[in-house]
């Protein structure tokens, strides 16, 4: 099986504004790994994922990215960050929009696998809306 994707066309379909923290779309979704594009609209509170490693490649924009207890660092388009499951990470600020990531989660991450360091952060706004649901 194989797939071809027009990444720029998909990025162009993301809305200018959203009620959720991110809007995403799955490119592939297999038990061994999933790949997605997502646009960040608001800072993402400190959280981790229990079920997968994450590989984040910033396609467009600029964000302030924090991981574990390190000071936030600026990620710009063309940069990649990878980390293992249970690694606490956050986007503390969207510095340039649109901030769009290509991500690979291995194995597949179920959408509900977002464990906030501060559970109250889950109440700020919905975490994700799927592009196909808009």
What is each residue range found by the language model?
Residues 39-41, 49-65, 104-107:
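Short, conserved beta-strand element in jelly-roll/cupin
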Residues 50-52, 59, 69, 85, ...:
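Short loop/turn positions at the edges of beta-strands in beta-sheet-rich folds
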Residues 1-37, 45-46, 117-134:
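A short, N-terminal "cap"/entry segment at the start of jelly-roll beta-barrel domains
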Residues 31-32, 70, 96-97:
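Short strand-connecting beta-turns/loops that link adjacent beta-strands
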Residues 26, 45-50, 67, 73-74, ...:
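Short histidine-centered beta-strand/loop micro-motifs
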Residues 85-114:
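Ligand-binding loop in jelly-roll beta-barrel domains
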Residues 34, 55, 62-64, 88, ...:
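Structural motif
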């Amino acid at each position: 099986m194989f797939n071809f994707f027009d990444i720029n066309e998909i990025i162009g379909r993301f809305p200018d504004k959203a009620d959720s923290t991110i809007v995403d779309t799955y490119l592939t979704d297999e038990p061994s790994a999933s790949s997605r594009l997502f646009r960040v609209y608001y800072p993402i509170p400190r959280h981790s994922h229990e079920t997968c490693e994450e590989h984040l490649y910033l396609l467009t924009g600029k964000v302030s990215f924090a991981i574990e207890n390190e000071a936030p660092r600026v990620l710009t388009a063309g940069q990649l960050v990878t980390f293992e499951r249970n690694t606490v990470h956050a986007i503390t600020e969207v510095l340039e929009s649109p901030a769009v990531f290509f991500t690979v989660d291995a194995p597949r991450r179920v959408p509900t696998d977002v464990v906030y360091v501060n559970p109250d952060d889950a109440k700020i706004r919905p975490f994700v809306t799927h592009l196909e649901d808009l």
